């Protein structure tokens, strides 16, 4: 995969990168990636694709064995209880629930991307894994499982969720930023033609590290364009940033004025009250 420079996204990111909201920073970024694979990407892709396919085949085999055993038990129960219609009904009802209940081995076979026995489903998941590794080079998402992702059912739900989250932190969001955000994304990725996924944060990833008070992330994937836009946003405590910079945690906690001075020294972004939209 390859990072795509976009002047429109750069303009949005200059505003989203470091929004001062008092004792914390709202740090968001929009990144565009091409799904065309280079030499090293192809090697990683083949390795992950083989691993996911083998895991899918293994779990599918386990499910077939389970279903076969259930069918055998069903026949045995019917034969042994042929003299009692009530027992037959009870046994059949119990088996029906058991057969229709999700198997713990089915997660890899039926995923947010579709059946993992399907190469297209595996390809989509691998794209998202590779993108996460590029976006967060200090972390490794290679071992991520299908259940760590979620497919969003509706573009409108995603838009409403992002608007609500950002409006809670950004002054005059609906007046100055909302229209620019969504018109830019529409021109970049054709939102109506996108599949939208999110990554579910787990311990040890950048969305759950110390100081992250809130986060969201969305992948807007346009198959026909072979392009993904990744929208990541984290609400990070200024105090944690101060500690990460090497300050002595035994010192008295800084007051708000000290936190603001530290922020102004290390970040070039404007505060909310001095927003500049190009």
From Swiss-Prot:
InterPro entries: Maf1 (IPR015257), Maf1_sf (IPR038564). Residues 59-114 are annotated as: Disordered. Element of the TORC1 signaling pathway that acts as a mediator of diverse signals and that represses RNA polymerase III transcription. Inhibits the de novo assembly of TFIIIB onto DNA. Belongs to the MAF1 family. It holds the Pfam family Maf1. GO terms for molecular function: RNA polymerase III core binding. It comes from the Eukaryota. GO terms for biological process: negative regulation of transcription by RNA polymerase III. Keywords: Cytoplasm, Nucleus, Repressor, Transcription, Transcription regulation. This is Repressor of RNA polymerase III transcription. Residues 102-114 have a biased composition (Polar residues). Residues 64-101 have a biased composition (Low complexity). It comes from Dictyostelium discoideum. Its main location: nucleus.
